[in-house]
Amino acid sequence: MIGLPGDFTPPSRFVRAVAWSQTARPLEKSDEAIYELFRILDNFNVPLGAAEGSNSEQTNLKGMRSSTIWTSGWDLTQKVLYFHTQHNRRARQVTLNKIDFTGEEIAHIALDDKKEQDIKDITLNAR
């Protein structure tokens, strides 16, 4: 797919990102803006094995290093990091104002509790 318009090479993704960023809707609420940001950034996810230089025989399926591992956005005013991962698309947040940075120990937060995402069956809700 390298060389095709809209491929997954960094220059192609950058040009598309500029175009999408210039057409983003102005939104008043930060949560709406974060969802809009994720909708835009999802256009640039790299599928497993599609990265430049990837080879299907060498693709690291376990580590998935050739694909988009996480997507993040910031609310700089409220100091909140938002992200979702390739294992769970639910948006999560880390509120930096709630973390004590005065200690000497490094704090760790797991990106995923479990590397899975459930699918909720809503068939019985049909009317």
Which residues does each predicted region cover?
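C-terminus-biased signal that marks the final domain/tail of proteins
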Residues: 1-127
